[in-house]
Amino acid sequence: MNDRVFEQTMNQNHQGGAARECVLEAHGITKTFMQGGFNVQVLDNAQVSVRRGEKLAIVGASGSGKSTLLHVLGGLDEPSAGQVSLLGKPFTQLAERERNDLRNRALGFVYQFHHLLPEFTALDNVAMPLRIRRMSAEEARHHAREMLEQVGLGARAKHRPGELSGGERQRVAIARALVTKPACVLADEPTGNLDGSTADHVFHLMLELSRTLDTSFVIVTHDPDLAARCDRILRLRDGVLHEEPAVPV
C-alpha cells in the first residue's frame, strides 16, 4: 500500500468515527486593515472548527488572507471582530499571560522557512521550547531526541542547520513544533521551499505524526494535491471561507 492510499484509508476511517472534541474554534472572524486611507477587509465572518487529530487544509490565491487567518487562529494577531477559542478557552477572556501560556502549551507552529537557530544543533533547536518552559536541560534533550527519532533524524541530532538538507531542516522544525505535545499545529506553507519529492515526504510525515500523536494540523498550502490528502479543505476567497468536497487521491 503506497503512502497516498494509506493516507486516504486513514482519513476515511477518521471521518467515519464518532465526533471528537474541538481543539480550536473560530466564530465570526473579521479582519480589516487600513491601506491607502481605505478599509480593506481580509476576513469576513470566517468560521473554523478543528477536531482532535483532524488534518485541515486552507487553500486560496496568494494574498487572499490565509496567513492572516492562521495568525488569528494562533492568537498572534487579534481579529477586528469575532472570537477564537483554544481547548474551549476564548482568547478574549484571558489575560495576556494566560493567553501566552495556553498558546505555548497547546499550539505548535511550522513555517515555510524553518527559523532554526544556526548556532545550535538540531537536538538543541528541538529542545528549545521545553527549555523555555523551564524543563531541565537533560530532560528537554531526552524528549527532543525522542522526537528527532520520530521524524527520522536521530542520527543527525548533533548537526547544525547549515549541515542539513532543506528537507531535514524542515523535519527538525516539525519536531520542534511537536516536542511540547500540542493539541494543534498551525503550518504556513510548510513545504513551500522544498522540491516535489521532498515536499511529498515531509507532508506525509506530518500526516503520519498527526495520526500517531493524535495532534490536529491546520495547513496552509498552494498545492492542491497535498491539500487533497487532508481530512477537509477550506478555500478562502474574497475574505470568505468555503468548505470544498473531499476529492479522492
From Swiss-Prot:
GO terms for cellular component: plasma membrane. Signal peptide: none annotated. It is an enzyme of class 7 (translocase). ATP binds at residues 60-67. InterPro entries: AAA+_ATPase (IPR003593), ABC_transporter-like_ATP-bd (IPR003439), ABC_transporter-like_CS (IPR017871), ABC_transpr_LolD-like (IPR015854), LolD_lipo_ATP-bd (IPR011924), MacB-like_ATP-bd (IPR017911), P-loop_NTPase (IPR027417). One of its GO terms (molecular function) is ATP hydrolysis activity. CDD domains: ABC_MJ0796_LolCDE_FtsE. It is a peripheral membrane protein. The keyword Transmembrane helix does not apply. Its EC number is 7.6.2.-. Belongs to the ABC transporter superfamily. Lipoprotein translocase (TC 3.A.1.125) family. The complex is composed of two ATP-binding proteins (LolD) and two transmembrane proteins (LolC and LolE). This is Lipoprotein-releasing system ATP-binding protein LolD. It comes from Burkholderia thailandensis (strain ATCC 700388 / DSM 13276 / CCUG 48851 / CIP 106301 / E264). The gene is lolD.
